[in-house]
Amino acid sequence: MADLSSRVNELHDLLNQYSYEYYVEDNPSVPDSEYDKLLHELIKIEEEHPEFKTVDSPTVRVGGEAQASFNKVNHDTPMLSLGNAFNEDDLRKFDQRIREQIGNVEYMCELKIDGLAVSLKYVDGYFVQGLTRGDGTTGEDITENLKTIHAIPLKMKEPLNVEVRGEAYMPRRSFLRLNEEKEKNDEQLFANPRNAAAGSLRQLDSKLTAKRKLSVFIYSVNDFTDFNARSQSEALDELDKLGFTTNKNRARVSDIDGVLEYIEKWTSQRESLPYDIDGIVIKVNDLDQQDEMGFTQKSPRWAIAYKFPAEEVVTKLLDIELSIGRTGVVTPTAILEPVKVAGTTVSRASLHNEDLIHDRDIRIGDSVVVKKAGDIIPEVVRSIPERRPEDAVTYHMPTHCPSCGHELVRIEGEVALRCINPKCQAQLVEGLIHFVSRQAMNIDGLGTKIIQQLYQSELIKDVADIFYLTEEDLLPLDRMGQKKVDNLLAAIQQAKDNSLENLLFGLGIRHLGVKASQVLAEKYETIDRLLTVTEAELVEIHDIGDKVAQSVVTYLENEDIRALIQKLKDKHVNMIYKGIKTSDIEGHPEFSGKTIVLTGKLHQMTRNEASKWLASQGAKVTSSVTKNTDVVIAGEDAGSKLTKAQSLGIEIWTEQQFVDKQNELNS
């Protein structure tokens, strides 16, 4: 047994060393196969001799049992955001404020990693808890997922009690590999590495997180008591010595001109990095000076984040293609010579509508400027007429639908051209894709490519046909093995039990969104009652306007639609509202019977989760602020709704006040 104990210690040392070389130094000394062999040896020993499994074992990196949900936990000290600078003038004003308060200053410049802020707590040197930033006061406990990140030490090199903060991110190579895998499985791709990192860290099954190959850079420590550091630069050096991964592309500079030089350098070199950055963080380096400057309610006075402007690149417009949405809107898309924008290769970009093409004088063959709106959605900003070739072609939208050949129309008051043929193939396919989407019937495994195959094979012609699919229909399809078919049929069966509002939204009735579907389902309770409703009745319902009322009645009066509903009934698809009616709920008097509006960005829950919880307490959640509104819950960046509420003297809660009230009810 002593020999086995010695071997376990040896395996710990080897695996930790090889992991550090691979994930932190990016300089592995052994092949992956050697690491895997040693890891499996340790796993086997721990399975046969559980007494040898420790909290800092390298096997923890593999992930553990799936969790039911993430607990909300208060931060010991708030995770504040930074003020933003967008240009040189903003930075010089920041520098002036600093010097007026504390005199001469040295700055620390660090890359702003485009990821997810996390807080890591260590007790006696062991990693015990990891939280997301959340709203800065309360975060989610994602400890098990963070343990799978090799750049996070499970045990520090010194037995300290400390809390460090950093940015979890997905390296570009991990992002490309993940999206390649998703594409093979006909799953929706992640838009960028940041979204991929955030989604990976919120997996309830840490084994899935482990497969995503995330990393982290630590950038600060909460309490310097056990640190012999007098500056930010010395603190980062101390963190390195303790086994943490900090970003080495940092620099101490003596003045604001040095800051500007650092920004210029990394603005031009950011694409050479193996991870995404979205700016530069500038901090007063001296810790005593930081203490002297202090904090505002939202951010430290001694630091600022310079945000990179949206990157613009020039490429060639090769062609313009059209896509037809489920409501018949015809959208032009630019086909581009592939070009790298904000870290990803772009070959297609939105042109929105015909008016934009003409207003910006965009022609096929032009050199065009492309950027990503919010570093996510590619769009063509403008053409460059001085580079225009002689054979550039002025684009004219077609008069007939490229899918079905029906004449296109422009409805008064709209900029978009629209195909109004209800049997248009492109619209039908898009309608099927919408029907199975998450907020509609939520049929997992029915991706775009599978739906296209099913439609082209004439196995489905309308949404009801989905519930008639059999194993024999699905097995011959591309990339559809037995297990995938079994899972898909189970998902289809499960979708039959969805509540009425899911079905209503899934049917794709024009102007009828998620919220209005919920309102109608709760009001009428069954599809049969809805089939008898009049336009005059609908417009009397709060949150149902004239357009929605007219659209719903016209849709449900159509004989083809009534036949479709019967076809769904024949396969026992639920047509009844399964939720609790707001009027029947005896909720807490703090919420019951009140009309509440949510506005701004929430951090501790989604808007949908907040709405459902409020409804469970008997509140009525509406989308607009009126004199009848009782409370407005204002998240981050709340806009005109908050302003209107203030002018009407309506009670306003912050997100934290709302969460506190929830906690009071639950305690």
Swiss-Prot record:
NAD(+) binds at residues 32-36, 81-82, 110, 133, 167, 283, 307. It catalyses: NAD(+) + (deoxyribonucleotide)n-3'-hydroxyl + 5'-phospho-(deoxyribonucleotide)m = (deoxyribonucleotide)n+m + AMP + beta-nicotinamide D-nucleotide. Residues 586-667 form the BRCT domain. Its cofactor is Mg(2+); Mn(2+). Zn(2+) binds at residues 401, 404, 419, 424. The active site is at residue 112. One of its GO terms (molecular function) is metal ion binding. Its EC number is 6.5.1.2. Belongs to the NAD-dependent DNA ligase family. LigA subfamily. DNA ligase that catalyzes the formation of phosphodiester linkages between 5'-phosphoryl and 3'-hydroxyl groups in double-stranded DNA using NAD as a coenzyme and as the energy source for the reaction. It is essential for DNA replication and repair of damaged DNA. PANTHER family: CHROMOSOME TRANSMISSION FIDELITY FACTOR 18 (PTHR23389), DNA LIGASE (PTHR23389:SF9). This is DNA ligase. It comes from Staphylococcus aureus (strain MRSA252).
